[in-house]
Amino acid sequence: MRKEKDNIGTLNLPDTVVYGIHSLRAVNNFPVSGERINPNFIKAYLQVKLAAAETNFKIGLLDNKKYECIVKAIEKLILETNKAIEETDNTIFSKVIVDPYQGGAGTSLNMNINEIIANTALELSGKNFGDYDLIHPIDDVNLSQSTN
């Protein structure tokens, strides 16, 4: 188990899960429909995150190492999402765990996407999930964006 901390407190997450504390809180707080987010919507979200990373790099807010890590992670996640769209592999659904009707302005989905990008970037860099010193879901992946 790994421990992750946010402004509310600390939670334990299995070492093997790619999502983080905000996603887990959302699932516990908003267990609405049990349905999955449409993979086309996940892909669109990932494409927006890619554009944000590219922009943040171009204007000097992300250094080259963080930028490359984030881009590689997003590219990997887009490939997984494409497989879900083609209905050949559902791996992405073990990562994007929030309910489509998770209440509010999309904060839970945004944080779920931020966490899986950050943790995938960490994994590709040989780091453990949740070791956010290299890539942080809010400070790096969500840089220059609202959490909503």
Give the ranges of each region predicted by the language model:
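Conserved, well-structured ligand/cofactor-binding cores
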Residues: 1-148
